[in-house]
UniProtKB/Swiss-Prot annotation:
Its EC number is 4.6.1.12. Transmembrane segments: none annotated. It comes from Nostoc sp. (strain PCC 7120 / SAG 25.82 / UTEX 2576). It comes from the Bacteria. The record marks 38, 137 as: Transition state stabilizer. A divalent metal cation binds at residues 12, 14, 46. 4-CDP-2-C-methyl-D-erythritol 2-phosphate binds at residues 12-14, 38-39, 60-62, 136-139, 146. This is 2-C-methyl-D-erythritol 2,4-cyclodiphosphate synthase.
Length: 165
């Protein structure tokens, strides 16, 4: 059975450490801590990529950009996102919309949301109103609440290119 829409969800979490930049949605966020990871550790962009891949049963970002491969060390996650977007397009799909949430106790993310949406929209060839980015805290619960890390969740709706034509 061929379906004209697909939905995927994604999640990512990285540890907060000193001496790293905090990048979310491709935006450098001023903060005394940054996220530790093989690439730039952009949890929002990683969650979106996993949702895109999951919607088409194409695995996860670790399959395409393994953390054991030195070629991806320090990689800009927006470059990886562009590659994932090209992959789903070659499979005959386009993004209908994205909804996401970043969970962090600090810093306050609201002032950066529009810039994140605009950057993601540019990379994904979408209108900013097709991308929802929200921020919340974990009410001081768990590792995110203790400010040990930041996590993000994303849901992506893919639409068959045949439906768009």
């Amino acid at each position: 059975m061929t379906m004209s829409i697909r939905i995927g969800n994604g999640y990512d979490i990285h540890r907060l450490v000193s001496d790293r930049a905090l990048i979310l949605g491709g935006v450098h966020i001023p903060h005394e801590l940054g996220l530790l990871g093989h690439s730039d550790a952009d949890v929002l962009t990683h969650a979106i990529m996993d949702a895109m891949l999951g919607a088409l049963s194409l695995g996860d970002i670790g399959h395409y950009f393994p953390p054991t491969d030195p070629q991806w060390a320090g990689a800009d996650s927006l470059v990886l996102l562009s590659q994932v977007n090209e992959l789903i397009r070659t499979q005959g799909w386009r993004i209908g919309n994205i909804d996401s949430v970043v969970v962090a106790e600090r810093p306050k993310l609201k002032p950066h949301i529009k810039t994140m949406r605009d950057k993601l929209a540019d990379i994904l060839q979408l209108e900013p109103n097709q991308i929802g980015v929200k921020a919340t805290t974990n009410e001081k619960l768990g590792p995110v609440g203790r400010e040990e890390g930041i996590c993000a969740y994303a849901v992506v709706l893919l639409v068959s290119s045949d439906e768009i034509s």
